[in-house]
Amino acid sequence: MFSNLIVGASASYLGDSLFVLVVFIILVALVGKFAFGPVSKMMQERSNKITNDLDSAAQSREDAAKLAAQRATELKSSKSEAVEIVNTAKQNGEKQREGMVTLAQEEVQTLKQNAKKDIEQSRLDALNSARDDVAQLSIEIASKLIKKELSVTDQKSLINSYIEGLDKQNETR
């Protein structure tokens, strides 16, 4: 009885195992047909997306590096332009300063020449005034001394000869 139980159990075990095996194979086939395709498609899409994201990130990194290099070049260029602008401004300022100095020197020379002319004119005016005053004074003194009036022509010739004598004395000094 006990042996029948073991033989019966083994047959039932074999039948159950066979049934489970068939159901498992059917389940694997169904899962493979209905689930494995979409899952593997999803995994492939995910793999493609990750690859595209990595490629995109690499491209973005390259673009950023190019942009950084371009910005660095532009910065160097703008620095050199700024230096050039400053140098040009310095040169223009120096030229303007030199022009102003030259103009000021010319104005000083003109003022000196005008001052010399004014001084010479004042000296001549003073000499003429002194001649007239000396002549008038001489005439008054002479007329008082002589008690006689001289003619205008005689007065002028007397004065001119006296002044010429004074000029000659000033020149010899």
Swiss-Prot record:
HAMAP family reported in the protein's UniProt record: ATP_synth_b_bprime
Signal sequence annotation: none
Protein keywords: ATP synthesis, Cell membrane, CF(0), Hydrogen ion transport, Ion transport, Membrane, Transmembrane, Transmembrane helix, Transport
Organism field: Latilactobacillus sakei subsp. sakei (strain 23K)
Family: Belongs to the ATPase B chain family.
UniProt membrane topology term: Single-pass membrane protein
Oligomeric and partner information: F-type ATPases have 2 components, F(1) - the catalytic core - and F(0) - the membrane proton channel. F(1) has five subunits: alpha(3), beta(3), gamma(1), delta(1), epsilon(1). F(0) has three main subunits: a(1), b(2) and c(10-14). The alpha and beta chains form an alternating ring which encloses part of the gamma chain. F(1) is attached to F(0) by a central stalk formed by the gamma and epsilon chains, while a peripheral stalk is formed by the delta and b chains.
Location, primary (coarse class): membrane
Name of the molecule in the record: ATP synthase subunit b
